[in-house]
C-alpha cells in the first residue's frame, strides 16, 4: 500500500481533479480502512481467517480495477467513468487495506499460538516494508518512464490476485495448546 501512499494524490491530480479532491479522496481511503479492519476482522472470527484474508486481497484488486475504470481503459475501449467510479474504487481499496493487517495478526495467533505471536508478527512486519518500499519505488520508475500509473496499477492487481490465491490455498488450522484465548 505504500504505492498508494506515495502516488495516489498525484495520480488523482493526473486524472484532472483538483488537489483538494485528490487529498479528500485519499482521506476516504483512511476512513474506509478503519471500517474494513473492524468489520472484516470481526467476520474472520466467525467465518475463518483464510477466506476473509483472501477476500480482502480480491476486494483490493477489484478496487484497483474500478479505479482504472474511472480513468478509462483504452485497450478495452472503455471511456473514463469519472469521479463517482473513482470514489467507489477508493472505498474498496481502503476497506480492504487494514483488514489485511488485523486478519494476518489473528491468523498468526491462531496458527502459531500467542506465545509465538510477537516473533512471527515481528518477522512478518520486518519483511513487509521491503516489498512496500520496492512497490513505491518501482511505481515511480514506471510513471517516470511511461507518464502513467496504469502498468503499476495492473501489476498491483496481478500481485493481489496471486496473494489471494496463495492465502486461499493454505490449510487453516489452529494452534494446540493452552496459550489460546477464548473468543467472547
Regions found by a protein language model. Give the residues of each.
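Extracytoplasmic gate region of multi-pass secondary transporters
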Residues: 1-40, 101, 135
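Interfacial helix-cap and linker-helix signal at transmembrane-aqueous boundaries
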Residues: 12-13, 43-44, 138-147
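Cytoplasmic membrane-interface "Motif A"-like loop-to-helix N-cap segments
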Residues: 46-58
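C-terminal ends and interior cores of transmembrane alpha-helices
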Residues: 59-78
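Hydrophobic core of transmembrane alpha-helices in multi-pass small-molecule transporters
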Residues: 81-99
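A membrane-interface helix-boundary motif in multi-pass transporters
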Residues: 141-159
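Multi-pass alpha-helical transporter architecture, strongest
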Residues: 157-184
Amino acid at each position: 500500500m505504500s504505492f498508494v501512499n506515495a502516488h495516489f494524490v498525484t495520480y488523482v491530480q493526473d486524472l484532472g481533479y483538483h488537489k483538494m479532491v485528490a487529498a479528500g479522496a485519499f482521506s476516504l481511503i483512511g476512513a474506509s480502512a478503519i471500517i474494513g479492519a473492524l468489520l472484516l476482522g470481526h467476520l474472520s472470527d466467525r467465518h475463518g481467517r483464510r477466506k476473509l484474508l483472501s477476500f480482502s486481497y480480491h476486494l483490493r484488486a477489484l478496487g484497483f480495477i474500478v479505479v482504472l475504470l474511472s480513468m478509462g481503459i483504452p485497450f478495452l475501449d472503455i471511456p473514463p467513468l469519472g469521479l463517482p467510479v473513482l470514489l467507489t474504487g477508493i472505498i474498496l481499496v481502503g476497506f480492504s487495506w487494514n483488514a489485511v493487517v488485523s486478519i494476518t495478526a489473528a491468523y498468526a495467533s491462531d496458527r502459531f499460538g500467542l506465545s509465538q505471536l510477537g516473533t512471527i508478527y515481528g518477522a512478518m512486519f520486518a519483511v513487509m516494508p521491503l516489498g512496500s518500499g520496492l512497490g513505491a519505488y518501482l511505481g515511480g520508475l514506471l510513471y517516470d518512464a511511461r507518464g502513467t500509473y496504469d502498468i503499476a496499477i495492473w501489476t498491483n492487481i496481478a500481485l493481489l490476485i496471486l496473494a489471494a490465491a496463495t492465502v486461499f490455498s493454505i490449510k487453516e488450522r489452529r494452534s494446540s495448546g493452552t496459550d489460546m484465548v477464548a473468543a467472547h
